[in-house]
Amino acid sequence: MKKLTFIIAGLFAGLFTFAQSNTEEIDLFQSMYGIEKKAIVKEFVQPKAINREAFWEVYDSYETKRKVVGKERIILLEQFATQYEKMTNDESILWMKKIIALDDKQDKLIVSYYKKVSKVTTPIVAMRFYQLETYLITAIRYEILNEMPFVEDK
């Protein structure tokens, strides 16, 4: 897992250097992450040959939806990066509502796809999928939070 954390750290090292990211840059960033991630999933989840095709169909569907949530998160983080120095109490409340809702959306997505993976493979494969996704999200959140400056009280 240390190798995995290192990969994640490398992918997210420049997150707060985005100044005015456009959709193409976000898509490129996510496609790079998606390629690395699929190799990681293949290594750790290891669906059996009999279920492999069904697993990857469900996984690809999950990734499509996860990327949408990822884009929303990147946009929110860009907003934070440009506003944190002058953020008001009201703006912080609004930003927190959005990020909490996004975290909930992401967590529900994983649970939903855990159930789908369990139906097309085995409970063990589904559990590994859930463990890996939770690990990756936790590691990514850690890397992001580690780079985020604290908002000053005005």
Task: Label the predicted regions.
Residues 5-8, 12, 52, 84, ...:
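Secondary-structure transition/capping residues
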Residues 6-7, 41, 77, 132:
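General helical structural elements
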Residues 25-28, 32-35, 39, 44, ...:
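Amphipathic, charged alpha-helical segments and their helix-to-coil junctions
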Residues 17-18, 63-66, 137-140:
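A short hydrophobic/aromatic micro-motif that marks alpha-helical segments and, especially, helix-coil
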Residues 26-27, 40-120:
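Amphipathic alpha-helical segments
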Residues 1-25:
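Bacterial Sec-dependent N-terminal signal peptides
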